[in-house]
Design a protein with these regions (language model features):
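Bacterial signal peptide processing site
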Residues: 9-13
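Post-signal peptide N-terminal segment of mature Sec-exported envelope proteins
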Residues: 17-47
Length: 273
């Protein structure tokens, strides 16, 4: 099947992974963990991890002392419209998505993927999107005087409009194989590595049975997202869901389009190492 698949390729493209920076930066954070400790008595000072939010967030989630130093206490916490504050003595270490085999990112359009790894960012939000309860937990990070700090957490319901909401759609898409079959465009565009050229990728198509052979394990409970400033509009006609491994070379991207008010998968990219 693989031989026939590669022979039927339609196009070759340069092998460019827009997410390569985050994997490289997270890898580097793993090796620089000892360098991010900040003397308590001097307060937060910029470290090498602050140069990129991707480096910072891994260090923040991995190092308990660093997490305390980079969280504003008492931390404002909003449960819907109800405000409260978390004192430092009640704070529990938050691993964010670092204990998972992969994390996810959401975009409205492909050009927004280039913002990943931007070192000039001053404000970033890390999100947990709970599909079953239709809630979003958002962590607000700001970079001030060169230091990234967690300044607030907000838990709120997902906003919806009259059209099929992407999160509701994706929960069913990930758990219901019959529904999944109905919502995959045929033929499905497939982008993958060229086995004969390490610097190129192939674009071909998959039949429905081939999709089930190649598809990744999809998240069924919650989605993570890092909002670097990319567009994530509720009325967008397209959504891109990237699944990225942490330091293991895994990289899958799912491209969805809304047609006639309903979401469908029209392109699948597997360019992992």
């Amino acid at each position: 099947m693989l031989l026939a698949l590669f022979v039927s390729c339609k196009d070759k493209k340069s092998k460019i992974d827009p997410f390569a920076p985050i994997t490289n930066q997270v890898d580097s954070a793993l090796h620089r963990k000892d360098t991010v400790a900040v003397p308590v008595e001097t307060g937060p000072v910029p470290t090498e991890a602050d140069e990129s939010f991707n480096d910072f967030i891994y260090a923040y989630a991995s190092d308990d002392q660093f997490q305390h130093q980079r969280t504003v206490f008492p931390l404002p916490y909003y449960n819907g419209e109800v405000p409260s504050k978390i004192e430092e003595r009640f704070w529990k270490h938050d691993d964010l998505f670092t204990r998972q085999p992969y994390y996810t990112l959401l975009f409205d359009k492909e050009e927004d993927m280039d913002i990943v790894g931007d070192t000039s960012l001053k404000s970033v939000q890390v999100e947990w999107i709970y599909m079953k309860t239709q809630m979003v937990k958002k962590y607000y990070f700001q970079r001030k005087k060169g230091c990234w700090m967690l300044e607030a957490i907000n838990l709120r319901p997902i906003k919806k409009n009259e059209d099929e909401h992407f999160v509701e759609f994706f929960e069913r898409f990930a758990t219901d194989s019959l529904f999944q079959c109905e919502r995959i465009r045929q033929p499905l565009v497939f982008v993958t590595n060229d086995p004969d050229d390490d610097f190129s990728i192939l674009e071909t198509t998959l039949e429905l049975n081939q999709w089930f052979a190649f598809k990744p394990a999809l998240p069924t409970d919650r989605l993570s997202n890092i909002n670097y400033g990319q567009s994530n509009r509720e009325n967008s006609a397209t959504k891109i869901l990237a699944l990225k491994g942490i330091g293991n070379g895994f990289s899958n991207v799912l491209y969805f389009q809304r047609r006639g008010g309903q979401w469908e998968l029209y392109k699948f990219e597997d360019t992992g190492i």
